[in-house]
Amino acid sequence: EAWGRVVVENQLVEQGGRWTIDFADFERKAKEVKVFLLCSPHNPLGIVWTKEQLKKMADICIANNVLLVSDEIHSDLIFHGKKHIPTATVSKEIAGKVISCISGTKTFNLAGLQASTTVFPDLETKERFDRFWTNMDIHRNNAFSSVAMEAAFNEGEEWLEQLLIYLDGHFEYVRSFCEKRIPQIKV
């Protein structure tokens, strides 16, 4: 909105005790927009989208000529045996239509470094976004953040394993607390 854009929201709906995309609403609204920002996995709910859900969202975007930007910054923070599926891997057609945003800032506690990577489907899309970022004065990675990200991704596996155990303990504590003391809240 600060950049003169209009935000069109697709509210999640509860089905069978789980939150999901309201695909009928999504399809209606896809006719009105130019860009769809997907958070995969979802933040803050932690929904890990299935291949079928990702494909359906992507197919709707393709049918309506909507650019799909997939924010996959939380993709390493997955629990309970679920697996992150990168949106661009759902099909060959989708791979050529998705901009993927990735980063180790959440996973490796490097958020203050403002480091991320964007994967574009082609050079034309990248050049278009380079012009946009320049006009919006959006900051780029710096030498320190690039080295930190490289070190985190190359040497941070043990950190990630321990982090997931630690976070799972917190999840279990909250689940148990709510189950015993606030049963109206489903975790």
Which stretches of residues belong to each language-model region?
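Active-site phosphate-binding strand-loop segment of PLP-dependent enzymes
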Residues: L12-K82
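Substrate-gripping "pore-loop 1 plus following alpha2 helix"
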Residues: G81-I85, A95
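Structural detector of well-ordered beta-strand residues that form the stable sheet scaffold
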Residues: V8, V69, I99-C101
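A short helix->loop->beta-strand "cap" motif at the edges of active sites that frequently abuts
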Residues: R5, A63-L67, A95-G96
